[in-house]
From Swiss-Prot:
Subunit structure and binding partners: Monomer.
Enzymatic reactions: 5-enolpyruvoyl-6-hydroxy-2-succinyl-cyclohex-3-ene-1-carboxylate = (1R,6R)-6-hydroxy-2-succinyl-cyclohexa-2,4-diene-1-carboxylate + pyruvate
Name of the gene: menH
Protein name: 2-succinyl-6-hydroxy-2,4-cyclohexadiene-1-carboxylate synthase
Entry keyword annotation includes Hydrolase: no
Function as written in the Swiss-Prot or TrEMBL entry: Catalyzes a proton abstraction reaction that results in 2,5-elimination of pyruvate from 2-succinyl-5-enolpyruvyl-6-hydroxy-3-cyclohexene-1-carboxylate (SEPHCHC) and the formation of 2-succinyl-6-hydroxy-2,4-cyclohexadiene-1-carboxylate (SHCHC).
Highest taxon of the lineage: Bacteria
Length: 272
């Protein structure tokens, strides 16, 4: 059994859930991140217990690898089982969002209560687009393996999806992500390329648990995607592609509102 590194956060002592087992919030980070990225939001959602997961090749799971989406979904299921988590809400950002959608649609998730996706791509609709993306991701992976990481990251954060970042914010992210292990990032990037990802929209539309799509109001690419495919969209003010980092308070409020609407959580916890 392969289990991913993770950190548990107990509910607030005053939470009605503190003494009673209930659904967990399980958080999946993006490429180059770690479970710690979710800590500010998870703490603001403190009426729920949280599990902050390090995906393969990242954080404390840096030595773990994955053979595609099905394998990562299996590792996630085994991690939840090992931690005694039977009921959970799954939240994921960017790469973590894509993994979360795949897991919800195709994985073993008998206790899944709902799905929250931030800026996750649904996939590419035809083989030509998938092949082009696979080639692009292989080029990035080669750079992550061979070049100094700060140099690669400086170019990585120049991509159009990060256009909302100013130079200082880019510099901060390069410094923050420079402690990654380039070859491990490369392996994960190739294993989870959009070129390997199935087109998830049809399965998502058949999903039998509630789901929502969160997006920064400056993240034009994923705003357009959500609107094009009529996803249940909620936007975050003053935020780009990484909305939970830019505006954790607003993000946590959206999470709690969704959970309240979907599971009849008492309104008092929304104002905390």
């Amino acid at each position: 059994m392969t289990t991913l590194a993770c950190r548990k956060l107990a509910p607030h002592p005053e939470s009605p859930r503190h003494q009673h087992a209930g659904p967990w919030l399980v958080w999946l980070h993006g490429l180059l991140g770690s479970g710690q990225d979710w800590l500010p939001v998870a703490q603001l959602c403190g009426d729920y217990p949280s599990l902050l997961i390090d995906l393969p090749g990242h954080g404390q799971s840096v030595s773990l690898s994955a053979d595609g989406f099905a394998d990562i979904s299996r590792q996630l299921s085994q991690t939840l089982q090992a931690n005694g988590i039977r009921e959970y809400w799954l939240a994921g950002y960017s790469l973590g969002g894509r993994i979360a959608i795949y897991h919800a649609c195709y994985g073993r998730h008998h206790g899944l209560q709902g799905l929250l996706v931030e800026g996750g791509n649904l996939g590419l609709e035809n083989a030509e687009l998938r092949q082009a993306r696979l080639q692009q991701d292989r080029q990035w992976a080669q750079r992550f393996r061979q070049e100094p990481l700060p140099q690669v990251l400086d170019d990585w954060y120049q991509q159009a999806v990060f256009a909302d970042l100013d130079p200082q914010q880019r510099e901060q992210l390069v410094l923050l992500r420079a402690d990654n292990h380039g070859p491990a990032v490369a392996e994960m990037l190739e294993a989870t390329s959009l070129g390997h990802q199935p087109w998830l929209l049809p399965a998502l539309q058949r999903l039998n648990v509630p789901y929502t799509y969160l997006c920064g109001d400056r993240d034009h690419k994923f705003l357009q995607l959500a609107q094009q495919y009529r996803l249940p969209l909620h936007t975050l003010a003053r935020a780009g592609h990484n909305a939970h980092r830019a505006n954790p308070g607003a993000f946590a409020a959206q999470v709690l509102a969704f959970l309240s609407q979907s599971s009849c959580l008492p309104p008092s916890s929304l104002s905390r």
